[in-house]
Amino acid sequence: MAKFDAHLKCSFCGKSQDQVRKLIAGPGVYICDECIDLCNEILDEELLDNQANTNNPPQVKKKLPTDNPKKSVPLELTSIPKPLEIKSFLDNQVVGQESAKKILSVAVYNHYKRLAWKVKEDSKNNNATDSQATKLQKSNILLIGPTGSGKTLLAQTLAEFLDVPFAVADATTLTEAGYVGEDVENILLRLLQKSEMNVELAQKGIIYIDEIDKIARKSENPSITRDVSGEGVQQALLKMLEGTIANVPPQGGRKHPYHDCIQIDTSQILFICGGAFIGLEDIVQKRMGKHSIGFTTNSDQNKVDTKKIVDPRDSLKNLELDDLVKYGLIPEFIGRIPVCAVLDRLTKETLESILTQPRDALVKQFKTLLSMDNVELSFEPDSVEAIANEAYKRKTGARALRSIIEELMLDIMYTLPSEENVKEFTITKKMVDNLFSSKIVKLPSGSKRIIKESA
């Protein structure tokens, strides 16, 4: 049994155990309750000082560059690219999706005009005139389309064309504040980085949030468990989409009370959200295929049957806001994205065009690769059609095209660099058919094994 030591003292103030209310022991040291209270007061004062420094705009501005010679925003109406010019640039890289390209072209054009209008109004010195001026509010955009339909490609192509900062973020990594994952403010940090940490320039930018359907709440009905990566993220994004002063940690990660934050006004930032929304077609089909309970006349039954005939691939053209609510987006979130564009599912003909027509078409890319080995590569029209047919079967959109061509070209790119006498090479339909043809052999157990036919 340990003996009681009456001479124990606080290692910081030196008071004995009899002079204090509580003495806490550590590995070879002791601290009293009075010293603990003093430490808490010091930490509280430091916290208040840091908060005062964070909320002081001049101190924040000193840490940020104000001039960016590499980028400029055209704020004169005559220098703003017209919607036809923007769509023409998109046509060079993206095949089809005419409706989505028109919506994006008009939205970007109006974004430029809002920036020009704001600069014009800010330059006026007459306060009475400013108070009566019309305020132009932004219209955020929601892109809905199946995987591989070109949502991300449209955003990346816009980024090449625009003179404003453009950032792409992934919604799948976001969580509600206080949980493991990224805060929504990290989206703004990406825009800041694209602007070389220029706050004024970042406040005129455009942000594309990909995989936005992944933050849909897990159930249409309220749950007692907290949905930190679904509805919680939607709630956190509301003010940012609408327009607010957001505090962004310059180093990324979670906001810390002892770290300075950069303040960004999101009222002039255009947000474009995109997602595949798998299962949304079924919700639309179910709504359109509803029929009444009880007795119905023949004419009523014919009306119901007519609605049921709608092709599931075209059902998203009849999309309503209630369908998005049933999918898992809260009404407040939908209300802050008033413009909705539905991308078409890619057909076989569209996939053929994607292989050959765009500026960076896959066929052109592989021709360039083999030209570096002094080999001229060509594709027969039938082979392009066969590749498109195989991609259509995989149901992953344009992404399947690269996978198929990589598999098709593997042996060719492996042997051709060593064949000095080969100067031309042609991809035929037979080569494509031999690569992907298969037959099913039944095993005694009843299972199936797929064996590729030899060429």
Swiss-Prot record:
NCBIfam families: clpX, PRK05342.1. This is ATP-dependent Clp protease ATP-binding subunit ClpX. Belongs to the ClpX chaperone family. Residues 1-51 form the ClpX-type ZB domain. ATP binds at residues 146-153. CDD domains: RecA-like_ClpX. PANTHER family: ATP-DEPENDENT CLP PROTEASE ATP-BINDING SUBUNIT CLPX-LIKE, MITOCHONDRIAL, ATP-DEPENDENT CLP PROTEASE ATP-BINDING SUBUNIT CLPX-LIKE, MITOCHONDRIAL-RELATED. PROSITE patterns: CLPX_ZB (PS51902).
